[in-house]
Amino acid sequence: MAFLALGINHKTASVDVRERVAFTPEQLVDALQQLCRLTASREAAILSTCNRSELYIEQDHIAADAVLQWLADYHQLSLDELRASAYIHEEHDAVRHMMRVASGLDSLVLGEPQILGQMKSAYAVAREAGTVGPLLGRLFQATFSAAKQVRTDTAIGENPVSVAFAAVSLAKQIFSDLGRSQALLIGAGETITLVARHLHEQGVRRIVVANRTLERASILAEQFGAHAVLLADIPQELANSDIVISSTASQLPILGKGAVESALKQRRHKPIFMVDIAVPRDIEPQVGELDDVYLYTVDDLHEVVAENLKSRQGAAQAAEELVSAGADDFMVRLRELAAVDVLKAYRQQSERLRDEELQKALRLLGNGGNPEDVLMQLARGLTNKLLHAPSVQLKKLSAEGRLDALAMAQELFALHEGSTDKTPQ
């Protein structure tokens, strides 16, 4: 058994690369099954967010190159291009990395809680695809436990900070009084929900939620006294919007340069603040070329995030220690698990030998044999059979000069020098 964690994130790859390596929800099940089939991976899961795409894999033997090649082929990238941004963690490091990710220690926003939910979704999809078995399943459960402990035992989650919070903080820097501003939110997922909550708390005058389905938009809008519209209504709403924040799972841009130019004319070139949190991007990069548009992507939020994270830095060290301890504990339990199959096979073999000798003894008793003699024969026969295979192997090891193996056998059988009693002849 061997664990592998491989991927790219906001620290190793630009948004251009990240959006090319991202998986859509519709792709995941097929991608997982293909990954296992083509890379000799027994178990696999994929985590794909705006800031990272990672593969978590269990194999007989580490085959990172094959997995990296598959990822490049799947997204039609050159291997060299992908390798330049990719990182690979194996065994204990892979376990620790998963736990750090789920705990928010590897996030753009230190300690952000959304990543744990995304990790749980990755696990659920892998179960749906049939690519999670007992080993990777145990690792996910240990990862969730470690992340929960980090949340419970440290202050990493205090002073709520997220990409959504960073986007709203940036809006406050541009519009000193958000109470006079109108906001258009595109999407209705977890990130946009957080954005809506922060904007509502800041007293934004009007919030509009645009989504592919009106039902989903309405559910979110009702929570914050907002208005719900369809994506097709965005051009009409854009002209009235001072703040536009977008985060959808669309594979194609939702806002183009032409639509924004038209809105600016209607606004008489009153500035629009835009944040594109999506990967792939929802807003065409060319929109940023317009004079009256302030367009930011997730990569532009680093400075804002850094300013709001100082209060969490002290808790990070304690969280790292908890994660390291969790990874160590998991690896110990995993090594213990490796002995289970051996013990199970040994017990089955011993029980088979016992049953054979017991049946022989019962036949002798049925034929009128002396009970004491039969019991002695049963004990002697069972002892000889149980010791036969170990005796043969120990003699072989001795003949080969395998003193280390002999010492291990002595420890295995709890034998100590001089402890053997001499049996009377």
Swiss-Prot record:
Lineage: superkingdom: Bacteria
Gene Ontology biological-process entries: protoporphyrinogen IX biosynthetic process from glutamate
Pathway: Porphyrin-containing compound metabolism; protoporphyrin-IX biosynthesis; 5-aminolevulinate from L-glutamyl-tRNA(Glu): step 1/2
Site (Important for activity): H97
Enzyme Commission number(s) from the entry: 1.2.1.70
InterPro entries: 4pyrrol_synth_GluRdtase (IPR000343), 4pyrrol_synth_GluRdtase_dimer (IPR015896), 4pyrrol_synth_GluRdtase_N (IPR015895), GluRdtase_CS (IPR018214), GluRdtase_dimer_dom_sf (IPR036453), GluRdtase_N_sf (IPR036343), NAD(P)-bd_dom_sf (IPR036291), Shikm_DH/Glu-tRNA_Rdtase (IPR006151)
Gene of this entry: hemA
Protein name stated in the entry: Glutamyl-tRNA reductase
Signal sequence interval, chain numbering: none
Enzyme kind, highest EC tier: oxidoreductase
Keyword Nucleus: no
Residue sites binding substrate per the record: T49, C50, N51, R52, S107, E112, P113, Q114, Q118
Additional facts recorded: During catalysis, the active site Cys acts as a nucleophile attacking the alpha-carbonyl group of tRNA-bound glutamate with the formation of a thioester intermediate between enzyme and glutamate, and the concomitant release of tRNA(Glu). The thioester intermediate is finally reduced by direct hydride transfer from NADPH, to form the product GSA.
Source organism (scientific name): Pseudomonas entomophila (strain L48)
Family: Belongs to the glutamyl-tRNA reductase family.
Comment text on domains: Possesses an unusual extended V-shaped dimeric structure with each monomer consisting of three distinct domains arranged along a curved 'spinal' alpha-helix. The N-terminal catalytic domain specifically recognizes the glutamate moiety of the substrate. The second domain is the NADPH-binding domain, and the third C-terminal domain is responsible for dimerization.
Molecular function GO labels: glutamyl-tRNA reductase activity; NADP binding
Binding site for NADP(+): G187, A188, G189, E190, T191, I192
Alphabetized UniProt keyword annotations: NADP, Oxidoreductase, Porphyrin biosynthesis
UniProt-annotated catalytic positions: C50 (nucleophile)
One of the Pfam families matching this protein, by short name: Shikimate_DH
Free-text function comment from the UniProt entry: Catalyzes the NADPH-dependent reduction of glutamyl-tRNA(Glu) to glutamate 1-semialdehyde (GSA).
Quaternary data: Homodimer.
